[in-house]
UniProtKB/Swiss-Prot annotation:
Any GO BP: response to cytokine
Site positions for Reactive bond: K384, A385
Described purpose of this protein according to its UniProt entry: Contrapsin inhibits trypsin-like proteases.
Organism lineage string: Eukaryota, Metazoa, Chordata, Craniata, Vertebrata
Major localization listed first in the record, in broad terms: secreted
Protein name in UniProt: Serine protease inhibitor A3K
Length: 418
């Protein structure tokens, strides 16, 4: 029978993944992604953060390879959390493939610690004192006659803060509307149609959503936004609205080894945006170098700099991926999509498999934050470098990073902001 996992995520931007479960051998599933952060011990938090970063960059490289000339936006944490939730109900090789595909070493990290880590991460991201607006959670929509194992139900509730709802999948249109309305409400209308279609074989839909709205610590002035050229490559350009800020003090690093500049813009809460601007023609070199050690180096070597002028496009980009077709199998997650899938930890009454993993994401960046993001960081007692200007007028990478959880919430490649 079919099991759908849907993940949804919004970054005043929105991303949503969904997973659908059907009878074995059928293919019909959505996934919407969600993000999490860890609140366990410092060591456990660092381990989960490093693993999630490894997964984020590995997934990014797959997406970039298959979509070389398009915009990319996704929530790696949303995807990994949704798949980890599925693994709660998986056994044997099915479970091992999922967790190892997420970059966990099961000989070093027990399965229980992985789920506890994600649970702590979810809890830490839900702290009301965080000035960023973050809404994350999970929901299960269960066929009214399907008997879910009590242990799975309880673990998803306790560890992943999952709400449970009954649905009549024999009425697929009504069930689809129920799920999409729920996701739309949780993501402030950013993701309006996570699930495009269901059929009567569906038994369960798992939704994982994240909504993030960050306000720049120092906002851009809308009156300073002007029309400017954005160079798609050496021969093509487009006109885009370009935000401008003068005499900005923020953290910056020039990576000569990788031929790129890294700039940090902070939000008012615990998140910041890392903007990576490769030199002309060096994007592939930077992409190939992405790994946890690269991120640690950048964050460690960023230092306060005064920028005479910063230009950053105002943009909105969206992506929609079918991850079960090739991306996840290439990362080692295969059996869960086949008749051999063992999801007997979810229910013993039906034989389930995952038929589709769909990830939907939206990212808006404007003058006030993400939906736009801007920030500054000044460290007293440290001499600041002075940079004449930084122009994001060619393809660049955009990473939303939660400093407390040391985790990547969103990652994007802006090839064309128009």
């Amino acid at each position: 029978m079919a099991f759908i996992v849907a993940m949804g995520m919004i970054l005043m931007a929105g991303i949503c993944p969904a997973v659908l479960c059907f009878p074995d051998g059928t293919k019909e599933m959505d996934i919407v992604f969600h993000e999490h952060q860890d609140n366990g011990t410092q060591d456990d938090s660092l381990t989960l953060a490093s693993v999630n970063t490894d997964f984020a960059f590995s997934l990014y490289k797959k997406l970039a390879l298959k979509n070389p000339d398009t915009n990319i936006v996704f929530s790696p944490l949303s995807i990994s959390a949704a798949l980890a939730l599925v693994s709660l109900g998986a056994k044997g090789k099915t479970m091992e493939e999922i967790l190892e595909g997420l970059k966990f070493n099961l000989t070093e990290t027990p399965e229980a610690d992985i789920h506890q880590g994600f649970g702590n991460l979810l809890q830490s991201l839900s702290q009301p004192e965080d000035q960023d607006q973050i809404n994350i959670g999970n929901a299960m929509f269960i066929e009214k006659d399907l008997q879910i194992l009590a242990e799975f139900h309880e673990k998803t509730r306790a560890l992943y803060q999952t709400e449970a709802f009954t649905a009549d999948f024999q009425q697929p249109t009504e069930a689809k509307n129920l799920i999409n309305d729920y996701v739309s409400n949780q993501t402030q209308g950013m993701i309006k149609e996570l699930i495009s279609e269901l059929d009567e074989r569906t038994l369960m839909v798992l939704v994982n959503y994240i909504y993030f709205k960050g306000k720049w610590k120092i906002s851009f002035d809308p009156q300073d936004t002007f029309e400017s050229e954005f160079y798609l490559d050496e021969k093509r350009s487009v006109k885009v609205p370009m935000m401008k800020m003068k005499l900005l003090t923020t953290r910056h690093f020039r990576d000569e080894e990788l031929s790129c500049s890294v700039l940090e813009l902070k939000y008012t809460g615990n998140a910041s945006a890392l903007l990576i601007l490769p030199d002309q023609g060096r994007m592939q070199q930077v992409e190939a170098s992405l790994q946890p050690e690269t991120l640690r180096k950048w964050r460690k070597t960023l230092f306060p700099s005064q920028i005479e002028e910063l230009n950053l496009p105002k943009f909105s980009i969206a992506s929609n991926y079918r991850l079960e077709e090739d991306v996840l199998p290439e990362m080692g997650i295969k059996e869960v999509f086949t008749e051999q899938a063992d999801l007997s930890g979810i229910t013993e009454t039906k034989k389930l498999s995952v038929s589709q993993v769909v990830h939907k994401a939206v990212l808006d960046v404007a003058e006030t934050g993400t939906e736009a993001a801007a920030a500054t960081g000044v460290i007293g007692g440290i001499r600041k470098a002075i940079l004449p200007a930084v122009h994001f007028n060619r393809p660049f990478l955009f990473v939303i990073y939660h400093t407390s959880a040391q985790s990547i919430l969103f990652m994007a490649k802006v090839n064309n902001p128009k």
